[in-house]
């Protein structure tokens, strides 16, 4: 993911948590915040230490980033997203993780996601 598509700073995460709306399924919680002045979407990832050691957490983050890269044309621009991974993600394959991510994005009201 390019730098323009990332949320890195703590205050940006907090803004999305406090002002954004959340949608969840068993594997993910997605917070989204509209930012019309922004030309593209931005994603922040959070994987708790409860999920596993650093190897497991980084694997989950890599799979989420790859899914986002494949879905980038279908994700609404002008929004900030914070994706929080839950415990079941640790045992999922890439295909299952991507399918679950698409499901939670659809639940959040994104109409352009078709896969």
Curated annotation (Swiss-Prot):
One of its GO terms (molecular function) is tRNA binding. One of its GO terms (cellular component) is ribonuclease P complex. InterPro entries: Ribosomal_Su5_D2-typ_SF (IPR020568), Ribsml_uS5_D2-typ_fold_subgr (IPR014721), RNase_P (IPR000100), RNase_P_CS (IPR020539). The keyword tRNA processing applies. Pfam families: Ribonuclease_P. It catalyses: Endonucleolytic cleavage of RNA, removing 5'-extranucleotides from tRNA precursor. The keyword Cytoplasm does not apply. Signal peptide: none annotated. Keywords: Endonuclease, Hydrolase, Nuclease, RNA-binding, tRNA processing. Its EC number is 3.1.26.5. GO terms for biological process: tRNA 5'-leader removal. PANTHER family: RIBONUCLEASE P PROTEIN COMPONENT. RNaseP catalyzes the removal of the 5'-leader sequence from pre-tRNA to produce the mature 5'-terminus. It can also cleave other RNA substrates such as 4.5S RNA. The protein component plays an auxiliary but essential role in vivo by binding to the 5'-leader sequence and broadening the substrate specificity of the ribozyme. Consists of a catalytic RNA component (M1 or rnpB) and a protein subunit. NCBIfam families: rnpA (TIGR00188). Belongs to the RnpA family. This is Ribonuclease P protein component. It comes from Bacillus cereus (strain AH187). The gene is rnpA.
């Amino acid at each position: 993911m390019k730098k323009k598509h990332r949320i890195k700073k703590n205050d940006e995460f907090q803004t999305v948590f406090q002002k954004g709306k959340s949608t969840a399924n068993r594997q993910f919680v997605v917070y989204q915040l509209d930012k019309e002045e922004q030309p593209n979407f931005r994603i922040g990832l959070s994987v708790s230490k409860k999920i596993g050691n650093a190897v497991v957490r980084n694997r989950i983050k890599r799979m989420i980033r790859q899914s986002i890269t494949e879905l980038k044309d279908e994700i609404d621009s002008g929004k900030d997203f914070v994706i929080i991974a839950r415990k079941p993600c640790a045992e999922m394959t890439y295909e299952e993780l991507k399918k679950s991510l698409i499901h939670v994005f659809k639940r959040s009201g994104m109409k352009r996601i078709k896969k």
